[in-house]
Regions:
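C-terminal peripheral helix-coil segments that are non-catalytic and often amphipathic
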Residues: 1-9, 105-108, 145-161, 179-189, ...
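Basic, helix-initiating cap at the start of DNA-binding domains
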Residues: 1-36, 40-49, 66-69, 90
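Short hydrophobic clusters on alpha-helical segments that form packing/core surfaces
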Residues: 25-33, 75, 106, 110
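Base-recognition residues in the alpha-helical recognition helix of bacterial helix-turn-helix
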Residues: 34, 59-62, 70, 74
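Short hydrophobic/aromatic patch on the recognition helix
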Residues: 51-61
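Amphipathic alpha-helical packing segments from all-alpha helical-bundle domains
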Residues: 77, 81-84, 119-121, 131-160, ...
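Amphipathic alpha-helical segments used for helix-helix packing
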Residues: 112-135, 185-189
């Protein structure tokens, strides 16, 4: 005997309710992770903030790390949009200018979205790899790599034009990212800035110029031309 037919529209309403509940949980998780940090945040905290049971959380997310992965993807979406705008693919820009624009877009992102920046710096610690479903983990990995590819493209452009002496643009993009990240993380505390006696922007720009000098195919020529420009101004 056939079961009673589900009323028209019931299935769609349930799906909308599930989607809303999931968004409510993510919103609560965002508040918890932003205020306490990824390391100290717990599923219990998220459940309390969302005003649902702990079991309800697990109906929508496999683990705390899975929630973190979704928040990381939110941050990567914002960062990717800002990097694309900085790269300006439709504009005819020198490779060096593109690298500078990308670097400063990254610095701006860290200041305008500090909570997302901190999640991006900390998300792969602990048991993130083991506790995030494989498809979700791969999405985070691929989207992270996609952001870095803007830098790689700028370096490839510089190599093609003869401006940069770069054997492996992909590897050098990683070097640039790691170096600038180091500066940003080091000075993400007022005491460290006080110890070094240098504000973040100054040290960031000095590091970027040092890296660009190392990439330059003709560093002596560029340095002398910059010196002449400075003398003429």
């Amino acid at each position: 005997m056939a079961g009673k037919a589900e009323p028209v529209g019931t299935s769609g309403r349930r799906e909308r309710e599930k989607a809303k509940r999931r968004e409510d949980i993510l919103r609560a998780a965002r508040e918890v992770f932003f205020s306490t940090g990824a390391g100290r945040a717990t599923i219990d905290d998220v459940a309390a903030r969302a005003e649902v049971s702990k079991g309800t959380i697990y109906l929508y997310f496999e683990s705390k790390e899975a929630i973190l992965a979704h928040l990381v993807l939110e941050g990567l979406d914002i960062l990717s949009g800002q990097l694309k705008a900085a790269y300006a693919p439709k504009k005819d820009l020198p490779a060096e200018e593109r690298v500078r624009r990308l670097a400063h877009a990254y610095l701006k992102f860290s200041k305008s979205h500090p909570q997302y920046f901190r999640l991006l710096m900390a998300f792969d610690r602990g048991q993130f790899r083991e506790r995030v479903p494989e498809p979700l983990y791969q999405e985070v990995s691929e989207r992270s790599a996609a952001s870095l590819r803007w830098v790689e493209q700028a370096l490839e452009q510089g190599r093609a034009s003869g401006q940069f002496a770069v054997a492996d643009p992909g590897r050098m993009a990683g070097v640039l990212w790691a170096s600038l990240n180091g500066v940003m993380l080091l000075l993400d505390h007022p005491l460290r800035q006080e110890i070094l006696g240098v504000p973040l922007n100054t040290l960031f720009d000095s590091t970027l110029e040092l890296l660009l000098h190392g990439l330059d195919a003709e560093p002596t020529v560029r340095r002398s031309s910059q010196t002449k420009k400075g003398a003429q101004s």
